[in-house]
Structure formats: structure tokens, C-alpha cells
From Swiss-Prot:
Cytokine that in its homotrimeric form binds to TNFRSF1A/TNFR1, TNFRSF1B/TNFBR and TNFRSF14/HVEM. In its heterotrimeric form with LTB binds to TNFRSF3/LTBR. Lymphotoxin is produced by lymphocytes and is cytotoxic for a wide range of tumor cells in vitro and in vivo. Its main location: secreted. One of its GO terms (molecular function) is tumor necrosis factor receptor binding. Homotrimer, and heterotrimer of either two LTB and one LTA subunits or (less prevalent) two LTA and one LTB subunits. Interacts with TNFRSF14. Residues 63-205 form the THD domain. It is found in: Secreted; Membrane. One of its GO terms (biological process) is humoral immune response. Keywords: Cytokine, Glycoprotein, Membrane, Secreted, Signal. Residues 1-34 form the signal peptide. This is Lymphotoxin-alpha. Belongs to the tumor necrosis factor family. The gene is LTA. GO terms for cellular component: extracellular space; membrane.
């Protein structure tokens, strides 16, 4: 009688065993390595191979806009897109110096301006300057421009040195498709117009 602790296995020749292992490996290898196309329909697999970034781009792009002030306009603040570091993305458009919101949702809206001026001479009358910058919303829900972000400052120019003041503000807002975002600025002749100092934008969260 065979002892219980010993098991007898049938002897298999080396060549036969190798062939069995090779066949098993060929069956399991595609699934184990996660080769492209496994688990996909033929059309889906072909699309993934031909356009590997197409689906990723559609899923990650969100509406966004970044505008800069036009330096060629000294007495007005006109916004520009598609130049330097300015852009319009995924539905945003610029019309009548206003951003048009492409889809309803929550957006982060921001803007910055920088003002500067020269020192006054002792004989000149040094009167205070009122500087202000405001981001406004015009919507079908309101018959007028509603202030969203606002900054004001009174500047008293000195007699010896030039002056420089900046204003930045930004916050998140619930916006509706078709809403218009614009700005109003007091003290435009004192603006320092460059891509890094005067800008305005919004992006979907």
C-alpha cells in the first residue's frame, strides 16, 4: 500500500512537457501583458491605435481665455487675443471688447492692471489721482452691467520720485452660456501696457 505522504505523478518526457508549457504561455501571454486591443471592439482598438491622443484631448480641454492689453492704444484699454501669450480656447470668443461665456458652469475670473506716473515738479499743482479697475458681467438676467471684481485707489504723486501701483483680483463665479465679461478702468493714460502687467481672463473649473 502506498504511504499517504507520497504521491506518484506520471512521468512526462522533457520534450512533451516543454511543448505543453509553451502552448500554455502562448494562450496566457496577450492578456497578461495587456496588449493594445485586448478587451476592445475592433473599431475601438483601431481608433485607439490611430488617434492615441484624441480622446484625451477632448476629455481634458476646458473653456479658457487670457487677454492682454493692446499697447498701441494709449487712451483706451482694448483687449487682444491670439498674440504673445494671449489665447481663446474651447468656445470662448472676444466680441466688442467682451468675453463671451461658451457654456454654463463655474469659472475663475481674474484681471490685473498696473499704473505708473512721473514725479511732479515743485511748481506744478499735485492733485490726487483716482485709479480704478473693475470686471463687469452683462447677462440676460440683468439689464445693466453688474460689478464682479473691483479695486480703487487714490494716488498722491510725490515731488521727487515716479510712482507705480498695481491692482489684481480674481474669484470664482457661476456663469451662464452667453454671459459677457468686460472691464472698466479709470486712469487709462497711466496704464503700463505689456503682456505681464495688464491682462484679463477666465477659465472653467
Amino acid at each position: 500500500m502506498t504511504p499517504p505522504e507520497r504521491l506518484f505523478l506520471p512521468r512526462v518526457r522533457g520534450t512533451t512537457l516543454h511543448l505543453l508549457l509553451l502552448g500554455l504561455l502562448l494562450v496566457l501571454l496577450p492578456g497578461a501583458q495587456g496588449l493594445p486591443g485586448v478587451g476592445l471592439t475592433p473599431s475601438a482598438a483601431q481608433t485607439a491605435r490611430q488617434h492615441p491622443k484624441m480622446h484625451l484631448a477632448h476629455s481634458t480641454l476646458k473653456p479658457a481665455a487670457h487677454l492682454i492689453g493692446d499697447p498701441s492704444k494709449q487712451n483706451s484699454l482694448l483687449w487682444r487675443a491670439n498674440t504673445d501669450r494671449a489665447f481663446l480656447q474651447d468656445g470662448f470668443s472676444l466680441s466688442n471688447n467682451s468675453l463671451l461665456v461658451p457654456t454654463s458652469g463655474i469659472y475663475f475670473v481674474y484681471s490685473q492692471v498696473v499704473f505708473s506716473g512721473k514725479a511732479y515738479s515743485p511748481k506744478a499743482t499735485s492733485s490726487p489721482l483716482y485709479l480704478a479697475h473693475e470686471v463687469q458681467l452683462f447677462s440676460s438676467q440683468y439689464p445693466f452691467h453688474v460689478p464682479l471684481l473691483s479695486s480703487q485707489k487714490m494716488v498722491y504723486p510725490g515731488l521727487q520720485e515716479p510712482w507705480l501701483h498695481s491692482m489684481y483680483h480674481g474669484a470664482a463665479f457661476q456663469l451662464t452660456q452667453g454671459d459677457q465679461l468686460s472691464t472698466h478702468t479709470d486712469g487709462i493714460p497711466h496704464l503700463v501696457l505689456s503682456p505681464s502687467t495688464v491682462f484679463f481672463g477666465a477659465f472653467a473649473l
